[in-house]
Each structure stands twice: as structure tokens, then as C-alpha cells.
From Swiss-Prot:
Protein name listed in UniProt: Large ribosomal subunit protein uL10
Family indicated by similarity: Belongs to the universal ribosomal protein uL10 family.
Keyword Ribosomal protein: yes
NCBIfam families in the record: PRK00099.1-1
Classification via SUPFAM superfamilies: Ribosomal protein L10-like
Source species taxonomy: Bacteria, Pseudomonadati, Pseudomonadota, Gammaproteobacteria, Pasteurellales
Subunit structure of this chain's protein: Part of the ribosomal stalk of the 50S ribosomal subunit. The N-terminus interacts with L11 and the large rRNA to form the base of the stalk. The C-terminus forms an elongated spine to which L12 dimers bind in a sequential fashion forming a multimeric L10(L12)X complex.
Species per Swiss-Prot/TrEMBL record: Glaesserella parasuis serovar 5 (strain SH0165)
Entry GO CC: large ribosomal subunit
Record bears the keyword Coiled coil: no
Job of this protein: Forms part of the ribosomal stalk, playing a central role in the interaction of the ribosome with GTP-bound translation factors.
UniProt record, GO biological process: translation
Coiled-coil region(s): none
Any GO MF annotation of the entry: large ribosomal subunit rRNA binding
Length: 163
């Protein structure tokens, strides 16, 4: 279906707004993936706080101009599916990585975070806020327990020397 100028401008504005509010973006090629699988991916994306859109490459280039995802322009070739992570920087990358494992036709082209092209594996392995806090607390707890053990050992050594 041919798009008129107003439709194209609306698409560019919509994608631009999504890009401005996003933490990261991932670009993929979904050629060969069945409609049922794409529907599952879209459902999983909604649940993960990821907005996805298939957009013409020329419109996508215009939409990302002036955003931190302008670095992805070189990946806009062939059918392009773009996903913006709104809640966690690694959400879209994790979603696409897992989907690509299950669907060999699905190809992840690239990802961007903080204005730079990033490895999808790197973004997908970023811990969520809750995971990062849990790791920090575990490290702090571990350090406190270690300090207590060293203090008790020093006290024991001091008492043995005195005896």
C-alpha cells in the first residue's frame, strides 16, 4: 500500500518520539519468520516494555536523525524491524537474542546504547536494576563477613600470643 506524505510524516514523528524516550535500540531482519512467531515476539515485547516497529529504511533514517540511535543508520538495509527498550537497556537485546536462537531465519543486525553501536551479547547480559542491587548487596555482605572473620582471627592470634 502506498503511503501519502502525511502518513510518512506521522510514521517518522512516531518513531522519532519512541527513539527519544528509549534507553537502547536493536535492529533486526525478520525475513522468513512466520506470522505466528512474529505475533509471539510482539506479545513478549509488550510484556518486556519494548516497542517494536517495521519501518521503511528511508523513513527510519529520517526518524533517528538527531537521536542517540543515529549510529544505527548503516544497519538499515533490507526489511528492518526496530525495537526500542523503554524500561531496561538490555530488554530488547535479550528478547531478540532469545528469539534468534529459536528462529534461525531471524537475524539481529545491530544494537545501540548511549549513542554508540554495542554488541547485542553485551546489551543482553546487562543486569536489570533488581539484579544489580542484589549483586551489590551480596558483595557488601560478603565483604562484611570476611572482615569479621579476619578480625576474629586477629583477636585469636593476639590472645594466643598473650598466653
Amino acid at each position: 500500500m502506498a503511503l501519502n506524505l502525511q502518513d510518512k510524516q506521522a510514521i517518522v514523528a512516531e518513531v522519532n518520539e519512541a527513539a527519544k524516550g528509549a534507553l537502547s535500540a536493536v535492529v533486526a531482519d525478520s525475513r522468513g519468520v512466520t506470522v505466528e512467531k512474529m505475533t509471539e515476539l510482539r506479545k513478549a515485547a509488550r510484556e518486556a516494555g519494548v516497542s517494536m516497529r517495521v519501518v521503511r529504511n528511508t523513513l527510519l533514517r529520517r526518524a533517528v536523525e538527531g537521536t542517540e540511535f543515529e549510529c544505527l543508520k548503516d544497519t538499515f538495509t533490507g526489511p528492518t524491524l526496530i525495537a526500542f527498550s523503554n524500561e531496561h537497556p538490555g530488554a530488547a537485546a535479550r528478547l531478540f537474542k532469545d528469539f534468534a536462537k529459536a528462529n534461525k531465519e531471524f537475524e539481529v543486525k545491530g544494537a545501540a546504547f548511549e549513542g554508540k553501536i554495542q554488541d547485542v551479547e553485551f546489551l543482553a547480559t546487562l543486569p536489570t536494576y533488581e539484579e544489580a542491587i542484589a549483586r551489590l548487596m551480596g558483595t557488601m555482605k560478603e565483604a562484611a563477613a570476611g572482615k569479621l572473620v579476619r578480625t576474629l582471627a586477629a583477636l585469636r592470634d593476639k590472645l594466643q600470643e598473650a598466653a
